[in-house]
Amino acid sequence: MILPINIYSDDILRLKAKPLKGVDSAIEELIASMFESMRNASGIGLAAPQVGRSIRLLVLDVSCVSKCEHEKPMVVINPHILSVRGHNDMEEGCLSVPGVQGYVVRPAAITLKYRDEHFAERTGEFSGMVARVIQHEIDHLDGTLFVDRMEKRDRKKIQKELTALASGIVDTEYPVVEREVVPIAKPT
């Protein structure tokens, strides 16, 4: 089932998500829906808070990205970055901040402890695009958006777009969470 995506300024995107205690049929269904929603929106990563669930769960599939065709889709539950190496600056975008892109510096490689879709504990080394997407999605689990990590001068350049999103002006080809926009009353 395709789920609507929460958009910039939705409160759930600023909450620290709660750890999962296990995987049941409801979580399995959520995982399948998250993959379907992510692919429908032409995304390569999606965190549960983006679809209205404040839990520490993310999915990613970078196989559509050039030079990443060999990468398999991943389910990451309760992630914890154990170590980081190097850093690089790359342009990012986000399904929750549609139409906005900006450069973000992130570690180039990470060692990650997490649980998979079967809730089996794993530790893995990730680099390149996979490391970047994992870090971007973990930020969602911690209530951080990529625009928060942009240089101040670069963020000023996108302020108009962020203001439009915050006021409910959203143009996407995928479903987003509808919200009531309350107009500011003009003085009489």
UniProtKB/Swiss-Prot annotation:
Which protein family is named in the record? Belongs to the polypeptide deformylase family.
Its source organism is Pelodictyon phaeoclathratiforme (strain DSM 5477 / BU-1)
> A GO biological process this protein is involved in?
co-translational protein modification
| Free-text function comment from the UniProt entry | Removes the formyl group from the N-terminal Met of newly synthesized proteins. Requires at least a dipeptide for an efficient rate of reaction. N-terminal L-methionine is a prerequisite for activity but the enzyme has broad specificity at other positions.
- Write down the required cofactor(s): Fe(2+)
Per UniProt, Fe cation binds at C94, H136, H140
Q: Which terms in the Gene Ontology molecular function aspect does this entry carry?
A: metal ion binding; peptide deformylase activity
Keyword Metal-binding on entry: yes
Write down what this protein is called.
Answer: Peptide deformylase
Keyword presence, Protein biosynthesis: yes
Q: Mention any Pfam family matching this sequence.
A: Pep_deformylase
Substrates-to-products reaction catalysed: N-terminal N-formyl-L-methionyl-[peptide] + H2O = N-terminal L-methionyl-[peptide] + formate
